[in-house]
Design a protein with these regions (language model features):
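Sec-dependent, cleavable N-terminal signal peptides
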Residues: 1-29
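Beta-rich catalytic cores
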Residues: 36, 43-44, 96, 103-104, ...
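Surface loop/turn motifs at the tips and blade-to-blade linkers of beta-strand repeat domains
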Residues: 32, 89-92, 218-221, 279-281
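Short glycine/serine- and acidic-residue-enriched loop/turn motifs that recur at repeat junctions
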Residues: 15-19, 59-82, 119-145, 188-211, ...
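Structural motif
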Residues: 55, 115, 183-186, 242-244, ...
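Conserved core positions of repeat-based scaffolds
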Residues: 46-49, 58, 106-109, 118, ...
Length: 324
């Protein structure tokens, strides 16, 4: 099944003529660390930005401590809560941020030492916090800073210090990180796995006990490195540097792009060499990917955009509400 192309001009590049009543205020400069904003990520109802000096601030709905303010208050909905009034995220002395990914009830950040730290709902954090069961990290006094444990299995202070994280993506309730040991890339995923979105051959929640492996078994592609990871609501996609991609997890609407609606990654014998690559249009490769709620899109090497999965509300941009 070849994936349907959606016009990038219609979806992304059309210049709309807004009236003054629609945009009656000039955008305000967001103050973060006396510098500009370099990275932003949006969760379900909270947002995080990293500035060019590699410091971070988060705001929005604060349940489960996901904004890292050591409380559950919302920030950004009242006066004197943004700019200089908004606290910086603290993950430990001397540590700065290189990437951030926000989910529904948690936030994860890639740290400058190659580790990942997460806060929010405990069972999603992939760290010792998960072993405490229900509850949250970041919603109470002295729960941030150096007290936040690292995600297990990679990073300089882990039991596998040779593996360092180089990118991260968070879905609704799971997270994945591309890791590297200076010779090859690997993938680690943790959180809820009810649809196989972790790619670990089960539907278990992973990372909430000390003995669970987060190592995702990907096909042996002859040393081709990993370029990008994108976690959707209940599926995950990975892009290799040669432009091939693969997806696993929930597939009720065909969002995995494999010509069927069979879920992948929730049972044995579905990952590794058995993992199917996405059926991109003939002769095309992908340069960037994005996984959403039951849908996936890829920018192709010819500049076109391919989207597939759930067509509800016209989200695929194919002038139809049909699944693709």
């Amino acid at each position: 099944m070849l994936l349907m192309l959606a016009s990038t001009q219609l979806i992304l590049l059309t210049l709309l003529d807004y009236s003054p009543s629609e945009l009656d205020q000039a955008p305000k400069r967001f103050e973060i660390d006396n510098s500009g904003v370099s990275i932003i990520d949006l969760g379900l109802d909270h947002s995080c930005v990293i500035g060019t000096l590699n410091q971070m601030k988060c705001w929005g709905e604060g349940s489960e401590g996901k904004t890292g303010h050591e409380n559950t208050a919302s920030y950004g909905d009242d006066e004197k809560e943004m700019g200089q009034y908004l606290m910086f995220t603290d993950v430990g002395s001397g540590l700065t941020f290189t990437d951030v990914a926000a989910g529904e009830d948690h936030t994860c950040a890639l740290i400058n030492d190659g580790s990942v730290k997460c806060w929010g709902s405990n069972h999603l954090l992939g760290s010792d916090s998960g072993e405490s069961g229900s509850g949250a990290r970041g919603d109470g006094y002295m729960e941030m800073g150096s007290t936040i444990p690292i995600v297990k299995g990679f990073g300089p202070d882990s039991d596998s210090p040779e593996w360092n994280a180089i990118s991260i993506s968070v879905g609704n309730s799971h997270a994945c990180s591309i890791v590297n040991d200076t010779t090859e890339d690997g993938l680690r995923c943790w959180g809820e796995g009810e649809s196989g979105q972790l790619g670990l051959g089960s539907t278990d929640t992973i990372g909430d006990t000390g003995s669970e492996s987060m190592v995702v078994d990907l096909p042996d592609r002859g040393g081709v490195g990993l370029a990008q990871i994108s976690a959707g609501s209940s599926h995950t996609c990975v892009l290799w540097v040669d432009g091939e991609m693969a997806c696993w997890g929930s597939n009720a609407h065909g969002q995995l792009g494999i010509g069927s609606t069979d879920s992948i990654g929730d049972g044995t014998g579905e990952m590794g060499e058995d993992l199917e690559l996405v059926d991109l249009p003939t002769g095309r490769t992908a340069t960037s990917i994005a996984a959403g709620e039951d849908m996936t899109c890829a920018i192709l090497d010819d500049g076109n955009l391919a989207c597939w999965g759930w067509g509800d509300s016209g989200r695929l941009g194919t002038e139809s509400t049909s699944d693709v």
